[in-house]
Amino acid sequence: MDAGFFRGTSAEQDNRFSNKQKKLLKQLKFAECLEKKVDMSKVNLEVIKPWITKRVTEILGFEDDVVIEFIFNQLEVKNPDSKMMQINLTGFLNGKNAREFMGELWPLLLSAQENIAGIPSAFLELKKEEIKQRQIEQEKLASMKKQDEDKDKRDKEEKESSREKRERSRSPRRRKSRSPSPRRRSSPVRRERKRSHSRSPRHRTKSRSPSPAPEKKEKTPELPEPSVKVKEPSVQEATSTSDILKVPKPEPIPEPKEPSPEKNSKKEKEKEKTRPRSRSRSKSRSRTRSRSPSHTRPRRRHRSRSRSYSPRRRPSPRRRPSPRRRTPPRRMPPPPRHRRSRSPVRRRRRSSASLSGSSSSSSSSRSRSPPKKPPKRTSSPPRKTRRLSPSASPPRRRHRPSPPATPPPKTRHSPTPQQSNRTRKSRVSVSPGRTSGKVTKHKGTEKRESPSPAPKPRKVELSESEEDKGGKMAAADSVQQRRQYRRQNQQSSSDSGSSSSSEDERPKRSHVKNGEVGRRRRHSPSRSASPSPRKRQKETSPRGRRRRSPSPPPTRRRRSPSPAPPPRRRRTPTPPPRRRTPSPPPRRRSPSPRRYSPPIQRRYSPSPPPKRRTASPPPPPKRRASPSPPPKRRVSHSPPPKQRSSPVTKRRSPSLSSKHRKGSSPSRSTREARSPQPNKRHSPSPRPRAPQTSSSPPPVRRGASSSPQRRQSPSPSTRPIRRVSRTPEPKKIKKAASPSPQSVRRVSSSRSVSGSPEPAAKKPPAPPSPVQSQSPSTNWSPAVPVKKAKSPTPSPSPPRNSDQEGGGKKKKKKKDKKHKKDKKHKKHKKHKKEKAVAAAAAAAVTPAAIAAATTTLAQEEPVAAPEPKKETESEAEDNLDDLEKHLREKALRSMRKAQVSPQS
């Protein structure tokens, strides 16, 4: 009975034991859908799991892996109990959330088991929507991308078109401002003065009396190019073929034409560009013309540089310098206009924009185009002439006005150049010879580009483009534009002789870099130009005087570095070099060689001829006598370097920079005049080295035998300098960009091939230059080492490129250079034989290459050159030889072969 109470009662019947789940099932509220059973075998659980995870995370506020996995485990059973699941989840989610969760989950499972794929239709719809949205988004993105691309393309196209428009609009402006204003006015005015003043027979300017000049200025914006082309062909032909005989005859015919077209074009363009300048310059130049009859003579010469160039040269050194200066401006400004107007702007843009690469291309195109187009030849020789004449004519104008001591004309160069020109003119009124300075001005034009802006911009002149841009901001703009024209012309001739002309500009710009030393150099060139013009006019005594005056003129050079150096260039540019060298016609054939030699020689010839006259007055007369014999004229160019070298000694400190550049450039010109032209082209690296050595070798040349060498080395260096003018921007760029150096080195790689041996040989001459280069070398020495490193290093790669790019060009140039070398060697040797044929020849070739290298180095490292030149003159010989050998070995083994032939 004790346990009777518990008998027969089961746990279910016992109130103490209840089934709590049953109670919960009775108590809890469940969604209706939970009544249906789900076959999980038909459901794709992997699709449901992401939803469960998401939902549980939403309910709990955080991701609870335990709960999620618990739910998954419950669903893994074939037929899960929905109510029991809800009861089990109530502890985790609480009753309400669990009910809601199960109410959402079960319909998904039901729809999933009904679906063939086991995926809930809601998910399918969601995914479809997502897919559609994705597609829409992708389409939008694609359309956006397309739109962006279209916009980019449009922007690019717009930019390109705007750039093209800007370039187009800029190029005419540059052309107008650059070539016309300085050259037209100065050349027409000077032509008028020439005609009115000194040579009535050669008075091409008879019709070009001051009155016709202004009229022509206005009249011949249209005529200048065609008439210039026509005249220039005749003039250039006269220059090359009939230096003396044709000169007087073509002069009268082209003079009337040229006065009107060239004057008109020059004057009008100048008016357009520098109407303020042109007015003051034309006035001052007219004054200058009236003031200096010798200038009037030179003008005729300038005009008929090719025609009466040699005769004029012969008639009187004074006439020679001034006519060259004036006549080349007449001729050359119009053709440069053409080139400037055509491609000069583009080329200048190229040169300024991509001076390194495009200067080489533009120069190559120019050198190619001049030979291709006889008219262009005339224009390219005109370019030469223009380099001589345009650059010469503006410089000449400047110089002529400056000889008359009319600062306004020099204003053409630039406001600063005007001041320096004024000082120059007052000082250079000494340098009516700077009409020969006009030739120098051709170089001067290049120099002007660097010099006239260089005087002040020379420091700014770190780049020719800088010169162009800020050269001498106000007047420099037109002057710079002119310079750009000249640069382009020079670069065009730089192609042929562009690297030389560019190098001329570069040395001058390196002068600018050298600052005062550069100015001095330019001034010393200008001095040598003006002294040498004087010397030319006065011949021997004036030479001596001008040499002497150069040292005083260093200030002039500094002040009128741009004008004064331009005269040098112009002198050298003075077609006498061309005319001297019937080989200049070969140069025209190999436009680059010819231009190199003629332009460079011209440029340097002006100052070198002064040097020669100074150094050996009789040789200049001989060269004058030999003006008809182009070889002697070439020599005259190289002798002008001699004269320079003699003036260089006095100018050394001031002139050294310019003279080292110019002395070295004259040595290069002479080099080119002899056979160094190839060397110049071949020895870009030699040139850099040579610039150091050349500064010393040119001084050596400036000595008795070194003066002939300098002539050779200076005039070759003039050509290399022209290249530098092309690549000085590049070289300045060269340091930045070696494309143009490549072009230069194409030329200079050719040069280095034949020229590097010469630089090695020239290195011996280097020691003499140390003394001369000491004063400038102080400024130079810093730059020269850099240039050595840069130019040797760049020159291998650029020469390699130039070997590849300019391989064909180099071969042609080498052949042309070899021919020219032979011709120049013969001619220079004739002149040198007087002083030292064997020493001059051997030293001239190697010094010429060294001068070329020195020109390159001096151009950018004029400041650094002097001390290095002193130390490196002895070391430069070894270092330059080693560097040249290494560079040539590395970059130009083929150039070594060429070097062996040039050296031999």
Curated annotation (Swiss-Prot):
| Glycyl lysine isopeptide (Lys-Gly) (interchain with G-Cter in SUMO1) crosslink site(s) | 231
Sequence segments annotated as region (Necessary for speckles and matrix localization): 300-688
Q: One Pfam family, please name it.
A: PWI
Compositionally biased tracts (Basic and acidic residues): 139-170, 214-234, 246-275, 503-518, 882-892
According to the UniProt record, list the residues that bear N6-acetyllysine.
Answer: 140
Outcome following mutation: residue 23 to A: Strongly reduces DNA and RNA-binding
Q: InterPro entries attached here?
A: PWI_dom, PWI_dom_sf, Ser/Arg_repetitive_matrix
Give all Phosphothreonine modified positions: 220, 241, 406, 416, 555, 572, 574, 581, 614, 718, 778, 793, 872
Residue numbers spanned by region Necessary for mRNA 3'-end cleavage and cytoplasmic accumulation: 1-156
Query: In the record, which positions carry Citrulline?
Result: 7
Q: Where in the cell is it found?
A: Nucleus matrix; Nucleus speckle
The UniProt entry's GO CC annotations, sorted and at most eight, read: catalytic step 2 spliceosome; cytosol; nuclear matrix; nuclear speck; nucleoplasm; nucleus; spliceosomal complex
Sequence ranges of Basic residues compositional bias: 171-207, 276-329, 336-351, 533-560, 567-592, 621-636, 649-663, 809-834
Sequence ranges of Low complexity compositional bias = 352-368, 478-501, 593-605, 701-719, 736-759, 771-786, 837-866
For the cross-link Glycyl lysine isopeptide (Lys-Gly) (interchain with G-Cter in SUMO2), the position is: 127, 231, 249, 447, 459, 472, 869
List residues, modification Phosphotyrosine: 596
Q: Which SUPFAM superfamilies match?
A: PWI domain
Gene3D superfamilies xrefs: PWI domain
According to the entry, every stretch annotated as the PWI domain falls at 27-126
How does this chain assemble? Identified in the spliceosome C complex. Found in a pre-mRNA splicing complex with SFRS4, SFRS5, SNRP70, SNRPA1, SRRM1 and SRRM2. Found in a pre-mRNA exonic splicing enhancer (ESE) complex with SNRP70, SNRPA1, SRRM1 and TRA2B/SFRS10. Component of the minor spliceosome, which splices U12-type introns. Found in a mRNA splicing-dependent exon junction complex (EJC) with DEK, PRPF8, NCBP1, RBM8A, RNPS1, SRRM1 and ALYREF/THOC4. Interacts with DDX39B, CPSF1, RBM8A, RNPS1, and ALYREF/THOC4. Seems to be a compound of RNA export complexes that are released from speckles in a ATP-dependent manner.
Name the protein family. Belongs to the splicing factor SR family.
* Protein name as catalogued: Serine/arginine repetitive matrix protein 1
